[in-house]
Every structure is written in structure tokens, then in C-alpha cells.
Amino acid sequence: MLDVTVSSTAPTVRAPANDEPLLVAENLGKSYGRLAACRDVSFELYSGEVLAIVGESGSGKSTLLQMLSGQLTPGTGSVSYRMRDGVTRNLAEMGEAERRFLFRNDWGFVHQDPAMGLRMAVSAGANVGERLMAVGQNHYGKIRDTATSWLERVEISADRIDDAPRTYSGGMRQRLQIARNLVTEPRLVFMDEPTGGLDVSVQARLLDMMRTLVSELGLSAIVVTHDLAVARLLSHRVMVMQGGRVIETGLTDQVLDDPREPYTQLLVSSILPA
């Protein structure tokens, strides 16, 4: 677990421009044979809000994230999302064009392994630029300028723009993946163990950068992590999962400082395995 000193005050959530939820999960469930990986999960996420989903390995948090982000079809329940026109749509009822819009424009997904979210053999500039081209930009000079600006924003020197991610360190790859996701100014970003596998010093630097970007851009985010320091630094609310169920939820500081459930108390005490 990342050992960093943090303020006891959670990030300040911006007042949402719309009082309707951005994303709604209703009674989500998924089973594999007799194994219930996720059971009866419901919650609402508002604009500018960051939700952390925490729990040990096998608790169901990654399965839940895949369903929320449209990568896995729920066995039961539904996921709804408020589109830019203000209309809330069920993901399962969206056409291909609407889903493509979400994945290219409105959503980002930061993988634990940057190689899953990057093209490792092409340049860093191309990794960022191709997402811009996917949303209709076609002026090479402007695309390169935007890519350069975003590399610098995630603390990657502009003189590395033509280098492939395979030449980058692990921390640089993760920062590049974040730039690739945020360059189109999505409204919602999904993060799956974004600091996993990184050295402690690299994790702390990455978390500080992520917290700044989330605040500056007013992003909504859903972050899956087993590291409670990540949850405390980034999230406004936290959901604790055990055995596929949400067993405790609330404001991050309240849950982590005064957990009610015995499982959450063990998790906070770092007794449970990652």
C-alpha cells in the first residue's frame, strides 16, 4: 500500500451544472456459472464527482468497472448515462454511433497496464494525436501542438514526443496514457488500479498530478483500487465491496476514518490482502 501523508479533507467536489446524475447503476449483477462476481449494485454519480471502489482481490470491483464502462454486458440490471443533450440513455439501448461517441469523446479509460491503453510501437505524439483525429481533427500542426501541450501537462518533456512508449519508464507510460485519455476533454474517466505496479515515489508523483488534473478539468471519475491512500487522495465518495456486494458506502473521509463494517475496519487496518 502506498504510504503517503495526506490531508484528512477529501477533494472538494464542484457544484454540478445539472442536478441530474451523470451515470446511474441499477441492480447490476454478473455471474460466471455459480460464481456471483457482482451482485445487486446500485448508485448514482454526479458531474465533477470522483467515486472510489475499493476491496481486496476478487471482491468484484473490476467486474463492476467493466460493466459500468460498457466492456462487459451485465447479467442483471442496467447502466444509464446522461448524454450532452441532457437526455439519460440506457447503455444497452444505445446504437453503435452513440456508443462510439462515448468511447471516443465523452469517456476515457486508464488501465493498470499502460500497454493496454497505448500503442507501444508508435510515437507518444501519435498516441495522443490519434484520439484527436478520431473526433474529427485533421490539421497536423494543431494536433501536434495539442499533443505537445498535453505531454508537458503530464510532466513529459516535449523533446520525447517522437519517442515510442516502449522507450518510456513505467511512470511515464502511465502519464502518457492519461494524456491520451484526457486530450478530448471527456466528462467521465474510468480508472482501473491506475498506480498499480509503480514504485512508491512514482505513485505519489502520479497521484498528485491526477488530483490536479481532475480538479482543473472538473472531471467525473470512477476509480477501482485496493489502495486506500489512492481513494483518500482522489475521491469524494467510496464504495467498499466484499464478495461481489457493496457493504459500505459514504463520503471518503467518513468511511475511512470511522468504518462501520468489520470488513471495512480490517481493510483500513491493512490486514486484508490486496
Say what each PLM segment does:
Residues 164-168, 172:
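Conserved ABC ATPase signature
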Residues 54-56:
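The feature captures the beta-strand-to-loop junction immediately N-terminal to the Walker
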Residues 142-159, 268-269:
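Conserved ABC ATPase "signature" region
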Residues 69:
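Helix-to-loop junction immediately C-terminal to a conserved catalytic motif
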Residues 249-250:
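ABC ATPase "signature
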